[in-house]
């Protein structure tokens, strides 16, 4: 459901580091580092090195940035490309003319578009740029060269999209394969225009992104009562740097708000631009008592939460152990999590005490670094076997033995990734009924050596109940293991059971 650019990057990193637990995370990590550097360089060129440092640290401390940098998802790579595009465009528009940067920015927008369809968004910055009053032309030489600038937009952008559209077009030209043409139609039309205008999932109200900003953009959103009036004053003065950064951010917000389908990651590309726009104001804001109090309170809240959760785990309180049991976790594996969380709380309290409310910004950076260190070194190694299905699939392998063949029905991608042997599947987006139509005969061919791993609610009533094995739970899904002898020729899944296993468009 996505063009292959992100998968190309993961395959390339696997060639460099042939160990999937590391390789599949590297594109996001490298994209996060690139985004931080680009944010720093844009702010440095538009203001000063001190402002650039504030911009980078502001971006680093926002929760959504850390979460996306640590996930093997496409969105961090997309944001690196949109930020690279803005870097090139703003260098030309505000500090140009710089034709190489301009061409690179347009090319990056094209590559971003074939990475995820909204990669063209940086081009929206051209709208406020064209709307700038003529009085700014004297300080913006590139504005007087708008005709030449526009002439490069389409060729450079199309060149970027040709990274994937070129090979795809050649393949379509030389092939009559209906599956290839359906693949192209799915990506070029259904997953773009149709998905935007007539979203079939994740339907949210118009104001949904205000909720996202108020939560995932902590602690930066706490400063909005001070930032918004300051930004407005600079917009009224017509400072082109603020006009382009803020107007572009508003256009992106409106673009996504207008679509009925909304997810929290959609507005992530705005974040670096807003951090750059906030950076020149942060030195002054951090001298204000109210700002320091809010940021100190945020650090203390994280510290208290860490101590409370960690203490509950370390003391074997009922709510902590009950949560672990519900997720299928072994209680012994939970204990290190408790100590890491207690350590996080101690760091937060120490940072707050050291700052004494006067160095709230520094305490926040220290706490953020501690948070992601604990998350990466303490929490995820303990939780990963259960959240990634590796523990579940290990049990499956042990139960069926090394010589058995394994099939999957109504499966998730992580089940396939964590399986200890080659797996036979019967479709991913196919209905359960269609999958059973193929899985049943497959089991019947070797009923004593073939097993089926299946989502519990996808098992039809005609499967022998006595032979069903409840093998475990993962990510709030219950799974069963069925030997080939549990199926018989007259067992057919009812049409009412035919649901999509991979819900269309889930991979965002």
Task: Name these PLM-found stretches.
Residues 1-22, 112:
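Short hydrophobic/aromatic helix or loop-helix immediately within or flanking a transmembrane segment
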Residues 38, 78-95, 274-277:
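Specific aromatic-rich, kink-prone transmembrane helix
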Residues 39-61:
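Transmembrane-helix signature of polytopic, membrane-embedded enzymes
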Residues 45-46, 85-104, 112, 282-285:
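Membrane-interface transmembrane helices that cradle and orient dolichyl/undecaprenyl
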